[in-house]
Amino acid sequence: MNDFYATLDLNISSLTPRSVKLLAFLQAHADKEGVSFWSKRKTCEALGISESTYARALRELTRAGLVEVKPRFDENGRQRSNTYRVVNTKGLKYRADMDDVEKLHHREMKVYSQIMLQIGEDSWAISRRSLADACGCSKRSISRLVAALRDKGILCVRAEDRSFMGNKGQSFNRFRRYKPAELLLLRCILLMLLSSLNTPV
């Protein structure tokens, strides 16, 4: 099980969802120097995207100064696959199970990244409107995407309100990432439930 680390300090609403997912993938498969040797073909297969989509996303990341592309050549001067270096930026560092992250839809990945950038080591409270503005999508989309992340067991979401603060009970969500031990416990419980359903009475 690989872990996904991200250290980003940018407003991801300026990036397309596919660019965010490609950036996360390159980070997860980079060495200690931040360099990824994955070829375009292998990356497209892993992410389930076309080569033209890959090219557009990579072009967006290079223009934003987040990824540097360096050509490689063999001893005969023939070009090999490029290397991709993720430029380190200041920001929060967070971790998630890469197996889970790779399965996220592009838009789920964008919302997940925005939440994780803010969540830090504890929890983070935000209104649906604020999260929608940060991600550049509608409040309805945020509700649907957050529910999907919650149902996949990636986020712990708790609805709260500020009625005690005298602001007419404005509602907001508090997000907390599951720790590895909690994820393991949740998966064990799920397996036990599935096993009990398959056991004849």
Protein language model regions, located:
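Electropositive, intrinsically flexible nucleic-acid-contacting patches
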Residues: 1-201
